[in-house]
Curated annotation (Swiss-Prot):
Classification via NCBIfam families: PRK10094.1 (NF007501)
MF (Gene Ontology): DNA binding; DNA-binding transcription factor activity
Family per similarity comment: Belongs to the LysR transcriptional regulatory family.
Disulphide bridges, residue numbers: none
Domain HTH lysR-type as annotated: residue spans: 2-59
Stated role: Positive regulator essential for the expression of allD operon. Binds to the allD promoter.
Family annotation (PROSITE patterns): HTH_LYSR
Highest taxon listed in the record's lineage: Bacteria
The protein, known as: HTH-type transcriptional activator AllS
Organism of derivation: Salmonella typhi
Pfam families referenced in this protein's UniProt entry, alphabetically: HTH_1 (PF00126), LysR_substrate (PF03466)
UniProt KW Transcription keyword: yes
Claim: Secreted is one of the keywords in the record: no
Length: 308
């Protein structure tokens, strides 16, 4: 019923509004074109065109079929290439999760541009997660590869890891915050008076990591690092921020860095992927990272030193 030739004939008639013009476009006779449409209407049991002596126009059913037919034809036309790609060991879909600390729209766009040029028939899905939410996606939600899992050891022996670097932290507040000009290390009693600005761990199955907050201290949860830094600049609260993301603001005296009794140690992050079952696209992404190629440099800018 919906063979490619019939679909092409239907689309041509719909686009030209004429059996004769469609026939001319398809290098067919008008009678052949008209008969193919008549047969299609008989097989579907609905009228697809309103006919006048000078032109034809789509019925509601015809309009619906037109919107679908173009997609079907595109799918049929691309299928041979898709099958060859699958036969060559290329995945049909690759799901990639990125740690919030490493996420950058420009970095994702750069990697996507590189991937799309090489794997035009693979569907790529990117997700942005926080702390243990990155491992959660890899372990339980069908993700193929993670950029920035916490730690340098896998949570399961079915994964491979490549250390990317360690995030250095600074404890900051706005330049006009009451604690900004206190001399010497701040005490817990001083810190507890002001809210801690944090981003909540996005883990759904694994245990969430608890961000810095003193017992009895008010906590304000924000969705991402951009909002957290904006909240610090606005004087809303205090907390730890990755040093590369706040150093310029510190140098401009918009934020102040202070020492507290328990400073946050560096956070090591790694690339992680499944040992088994991966395809060529994942293999190529891993190579980009292990070889520190420029296509993935945007993901690594948060590290003070990037391994060469």
């Amino acid at each position: 019923m919906f063979d490619p030739e019939t679909l092409r004939t239907f689309i041509s008639v719909a686009e030209t509004g004429s059996f004769s013009k469609a026939a001319e476009r398809l290098c067919k006779t008008t009678a052949t074109t008209s008969y193919r449409i008549k047969l299609l209407e008989e097989n579907t049991g609905v009228g697809l065109f309103f006919r006048t002596t000078r032109s034809v126009s789509l019925t509601a059913a015809g309009s619906h079929l037109l919107s679908q037919a173009k997609d079907w034809l595109a799918w049929l036309d691309s299928m041979p290439d898709e099958l060859r790609q699958v036969n060559d060991g290329v995945e049909r879909q690759v799901n990639i999760v990125v740690n919030n600390l490493l996420y950058s729209p420009q970095a994702v766009a750069s990697l996507l541009s590189w991937l799309n040029a090489r794997y035009p028939f693979t569907q790529f899905h990117f997700s942005r997660q926080i702390y243990m939410g990155v491992w959660d996606s890899l372990l339980y939600e069908g993700f193929s590869l993670a950029i920035g899992v916490t730690g340098t050891e896998p949570l399961a022996n079915t994964f491979m890891l490549d250390p990317l670097g360690s995030v250095q932290w600074r404890f900051v507040m706005s330049a006009d915050h009451p604690l900004a000009h206190v001399s010497g290390p701040l005490t817990e009693a001083q810190l507890r008076r002001f809210p801690a600005i944090n981003i909540e761990d996005s883990a759904r199955t694994l245990t969430k990591r608890v961000a810095w907050r003193l017992p009895g201290q008010k906590e304000i949860i924000v969705p991402d690092m951009e909002t957290k830094i904006a909240a610090h600049l606005a004087g809303v609260g205090i907390g730890f921020v990755p040093q590369p993301l706040c150093q310029t603001l510190i140098d401009k005296n918009e934020l102040v860095s202070c020492t507290i009794p328990t400073m946050r140690p560096p956070s090591p992050l790694s690339l992680a992927w499944h040992k088994f079952g991966g395809g060529k696209a994942v293999e190529d992404i891993v190579k980009l990272f292990t070889q520190r190629q420029p296509e993935i440099a945007g993901f690594l800018s948060i590290f003070n030193t990037v391994r060469c």
